[in-house]
C-alpha cells in the first residue's frame, strides 16, 4: 500500500511541471488556510496547495480511498474578462493532469471529484478541487 505522504509527494511532482508554487499543507482551520495563502509569494502564482481531507475503506475494506483537496490559487482580477478567465482555465489545467476518468500514478488511481470556489482573501481567487485517490489494500 502506498502511504498518504507518498501519494501527496507524487501528486506534487506532477503539479510542479505546471504550477509555479506547489505546497503540501496540513491546514485544518480557516486561520491556518489564510496563513498558508499569505505565505505564498504573489509573484509565484498560480499556486497549488495539496490538503488532506480524509480516508475511508470501501468494498469490504479491500480498497482505501484517500481524499485530498487541491486548492488552486491565483491573484484576483477585476475589470477584465480576459484576466478573470485565466482562473477559469486552471481547472482545465488540473484535469489535463488528473482527467475525470482517472489516472494511475505509481499504483494509485487518482481522479477529480468536484470543484468549488474557496477564496477568503480579497487579493486572491481560489478553487478547491477534490481529488479521490484509490488503491487496493490486499
Regions found by a protein language model. Give the residues of each.
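Charged, amphipathic alpha-helical segments and their flanking helix caps
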Residues: 1-30, 35-39, 49-138
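A short catalytic or substrate-binding loop motif that flags glycine-/basic-rich loops and adjacent residues
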Residues: 42
Amino acid at each position: 500500500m502506498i502511504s498518504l505522504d507518498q501519494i501527496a509527494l507524487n501528486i506534487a511532482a506532477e503539479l510542479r511541471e505546471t504550477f509555479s508554487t506547489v505546497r503540501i499543507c496540513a491546514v485544518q482551520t480557516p486561520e491556518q488556510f489564510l496563513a498558508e495563502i499569505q505565505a505564498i509569494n504573489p509573484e509565484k502564482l498560480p499556486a497549488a496547495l495539496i490538503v488532506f481531507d480524509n480516508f475511508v475503506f470501501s468494498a469490504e475494506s479491500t480498497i482505501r480511498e484517500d481524499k485530498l483537496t487541491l486548492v488552486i490559487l491565483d491573484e484576483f482580477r477585476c475589470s477584465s474578462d480576459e484576466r478573470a478567465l485565466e482562473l477559469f482555465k486552471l481547472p482545465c489545467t488540473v484535469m489535463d493532469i488528473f482527467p475525470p476518468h482517472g489516472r494511475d500514478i505509481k499504483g494509485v488511481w487518482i481522479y477529480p471529484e468536484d470543484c468549488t470556489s474557496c477564496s477568503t482573501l480579497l487579493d486572491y481567487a481560489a478553487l478547491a478541487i477534490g481529488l479521490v485517490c484509490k488503491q487496493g489494500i490486499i
